[in-house]
Amino acid sequence: MKQKNRKYDQYTHHFLSIMYKLFKENPEIFKIKKLRGIHGICDYENDEIQIDYRKYLIPTIIHEVMHYYYPDWSETKILIEERKIINYLSVRQIKHIIKRFANIL
């Protein structure tokens, strides 16, 4: 059985804490929409994170929250970090993200 990397465990936990804080303190910024050609967008001007519900929901939420918190990161860096988190999440953590996100809609 593959052992978990403690560094990624701490990193994932830290990011989830940031994301849950955003869910709790600013739930109104999340909008569910049909978007054309994209899965989601972090709209800084209108302080919105738009998510297309027809696409990959969990990775898109993580990706757009990263854009929200790290606006100076390149798209490439966001994609790399998103993949690290997605690949490291447990089933329990995925369920928790879904529950918390559903509660803000």
Where are these regions (language model features)?
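Glycine-rich short-loop/terminal segments
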Residues: 1-22
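Active-site scaffold of zinc-dependent metalloenzymes
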Residues: 16-58, 68-71, 76-87
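Walker B catalytic acidic pair
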Residues: 64
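A conserved beta-strand element that flanks and buttresses the S-adenosyl-L-methionine
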Residues: 61
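Short, positively charged interaction helices/loops
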Residues: 89-104
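Short, functionally important secondary-structure microenvironments
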Residues: 38-41, 101-105
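Exposed alpha-helical structural elements
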Residues: 11-18, 77, 93-96
